[in-house]
Amino acid sequence: MLKIARFLMCCVGAVAAFSPISATGSELKSCGGNTVCPVGDRGYHVMPPDGWDGQTPLPVLIHYHGWGRQGPVPVNHKHIGGATRKLGVLLVAPNGLGKSWSFWRPGSRDTQFTLDVLADVEKRYPINPSQIMVSGYSWGSSMAWRFSCEMGHKVSVLFGISGTLYDQSETCETGPVEIRHVHGLKDTVMDYPYGPNLDETGPIHLWRRTNQCATDPDFQENWSAGQNFRRMHWSDCESGKTITLDIHEGGHWIARGWLAEQLRQLDFTGS
């Protein structure tokens, strides 16, 4: 019995050593996946990548869910959580109040909430502060834009999926280092935001102006990742920041393979 007890104590110690909760935050309630991590009157869901050693600082993707959803949806979504798990990224999925987001005007309550979420994540996981990315789908994408507009100095990459800020004339003090947006031309939920005279670069007008980019993209190309895309890319912006706009012929959905390909290009796995 004594040998068994010693063996069990060793096992418990090994598990504790591998726990993603830091030593200073060991009193925090264990959470992850479908179990919410509480922050104030709501919380968030988190999922580390497969094969993580429990110690190496992780890049973070904050993903805002669509309207009427909550954090477990992106965590369990094959094109969101399925991508981050395989590509070395810690997924953080906040819960919106009333299953929605406050992105319509500057000064969003959800900007501060996101900062509070990040502070809590740092207590539980070692993260790389220079690799904080944001994304979202539909209204969640609009919230990702809002956070990036208000806290761009904290954001390395914005991945927008089928949603923008409605007022593209807004002024953002600073934008993310890199902006990648995807939108369907046949979207009837959050209509494709054409510019004047059906200008297809309309979805990224705010960022093109903020980053002082040329009117026309540097280059265009067709590519595929489960479905076909037409890409426009700006890399000559005076801010030194790049913009990528991917267009597809479909409607309002999370484009198959798109986010995974973006993360793969950034290569957080070291492969």
PLM features: residue spans?
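Bacterial N-terminal signal peptides
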Residues: M9-A17
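A domain-start/cap signature at the N-terminus of enzymes
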Residues: F18-V60, P106-R109, S135-L165, G202-H205, ...
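Short substrate-entry loop that stabilizes the transition state in hydrolases
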Residues: W52-W101, D167-Q168, T188-Y192
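Alpha/beta-hydrolase active-site loop
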Residues: R105-Y125
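Alpha/beta-hydrolase fold nucleophile elbow
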Residues: P126-S138
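Short beta-strand/loop motif that positions the catalytic acidic residue
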Residues: H181-H183, D187
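Short glycine-rich catalytic loops that host catalytic nucleophiles or stabilize transition states
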Residues: V182, L245-G250
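Conserved alpha/beta-hydrolase "acid-adjacent" motif
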Residues: T188-D199, I254-R256
